[in-house]
Amino acid sequence: MSDSIFEEDMTMPKAYIISSYRKISDPEKLAAYAKLAGPAIMAAGGRFLARGVAAKAMEDGRLDRTVIIEFDSLEAAMATYDSAPYQEALAALGNAVERDMRVVEGVA
């Protein structure tokens, strides 16, 4: 039991970047992006939780390539996205893919 009724759980919720690739028009550029993006994300503390084509689509789902990356916080996820190493990876990707990319905060 806590000694103080004023103590709060200061744990920040984790954040997840979720990318779903609707179309891959240049696999070589995607490979160049992956070679740069993976190390940039991991160096910033990101953890790949899932990566690959969906095993099954339900309701209106699609069998797209999907990537889920966990970060310790929303701020860490956004700092990684905005970082110079990740921006270099995005430049290598160019317009090689059409994807839906979003950041979702976890439940604290």
Model-derived features with residue positions:
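C-terminal structural segments of small proteins and small subunits
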Residues: 77-102
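Short S/T/G/P-rich N-terminal loop/turn motif that feeds into the first structured element of a domain
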Residues: 2-65, 72-82, 105-108
